[in-house]
Protein backbone atom coordinates (compact mmCIF):
# COMPACT_ATOMS: atom_id res chain seq x y z
CA UNK A 1 0.00 0.00 0.00
CA UNK A 2 1.55 3.29 -1.08
CA UNK A 3 1.10 6.65 0.62
CA UNK A 4 1.21 8.71 -2.59
CA UNK A 5 -2.58 9.25 -2.79
CA UNK A 6 -2.93 10.48 0.80
CA UNK A 7 -2.93 14.31 0.91
CA UNK A 8 -0.40 15.86 3.23
CA UNK A 9 -1.43 17.88 6.29
CA UNK A 10 -0.12 21.10 4.74
CA UNK A 11 -2.59 20.71 1.85
CA UNK A 12 -5.49 20.44 4.32
CA UNK A 13 -4.33 23.52 6.22
CA UNK A 14 -4.10 25.55 3.02
CA UNK A 15 -7.59 24.65 1.81
CA UNK A 16 -9.15 25.25 5.24
CA UNK A 17 -7.52 28.65 5.65
CA UNK A 18 -8.74 29.73 2.22
CA UNK A 19 -12.32 28.87 3.14
CA UNK A 20 -12.10 30.49 6.57
CA UNK A 21 -10.81 33.81 5.20
CA UNK A 22 -13.78 34.29 2.86
CA UNK A 23 -16.03 36.95 4.50
CA UNK A 24 -19.75 36.24 4.77
CA UNK A 25 -22.03 38.26 2.48
CA UNK A 26 -23.18 41.51 4.05
CA UNK A 27 -26.93 41.85 4.71
CA UNK A 28 -28.74 44.59 2.84
CA UNK A 29 -28.81 47.84 4.77
CA UNK A 30 -32.40 49.10 5.10
CA UNK A 31 -32.99 52.54 3.66
CA UNK A 32 -33.84 55.35 6.07
CA UNK A 33 -37.23 56.05 4.47
CA UNK A 34 -38.42 52.61 5.56
CA UNK A 35 -38.55 53.82 9.17
CA UNK A 36 -41.33 55.96 10.58
CA UNK A 37 -39.96 58.92 12.51
CA UNK A 38 -41.56 60.40 15.60
CA UNK A 39 -42.18 63.62 13.66
CA UNK A 40 -44.32 61.86 11.08
CA UNK A 41 -46.38 60.25 13.86
CA UNK A 42 -46.98 63.61 15.59
CA UNK A 43 -47.76 65.47 12.37
CA UNK A 44 -50.25 62.87 11.16
CA UNK A 45 -52.32 61.88 14.19
CA UNK A 46 -55.13 59.40 13.71
CA UNK A 47 -58.48 61.21 13.97
CA UNK A 48 -60.15 60.44 17.27
CA UNK A 49 -63.87 60.49 17.83
CA UNK A 50 -65.85 60.21 21.05
CA UNK A 51 -67.73 57.33 19.49
CA UNK A 52 -64.47 55.35 19.68
CA UNK A 53 -64.76 55.38 23.47
CA UNK A 54 -66.37 52.36 25.05
CA UNK A 55 -67.32 51.77 28.66
CA UNK A 56 -65.39 49.10 30.45
CA UNK A 57 -66.47 47.48 33.69
CA UNK A 58 -63.98 49.59 35.60
CA UNK A 59 -65.39 52.77 34.03
CA UNK A 60 -68.89 51.87 35.20
CA UNK A 61 -67.53 51.22 38.67
CA UNK A 62 -65.66 54.55 38.84
CA UNK A 63 -68.42 56.73 37.42
CA UNK A 64 -70.67 58.35 40.03
CA UNK A 65 -74.23 57.09 40.08
UniProtKB/Swiss-Prot annotation:
The segment annotated Disordered runs over 1-31
Can you say what this protein is called?
7 kDa A-type inclusion protein
Comp. bias intervals (Polar residues): 1-20
The top of its lineage is: Viruses, Varidnaviria, Bamfordvirae, Nucleocytoviricota, Pokkesviricetes
| Source superkingdom | Viruses
Amino acid sequence: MSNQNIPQLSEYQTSVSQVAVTPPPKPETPQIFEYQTSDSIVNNPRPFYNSDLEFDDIDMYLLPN
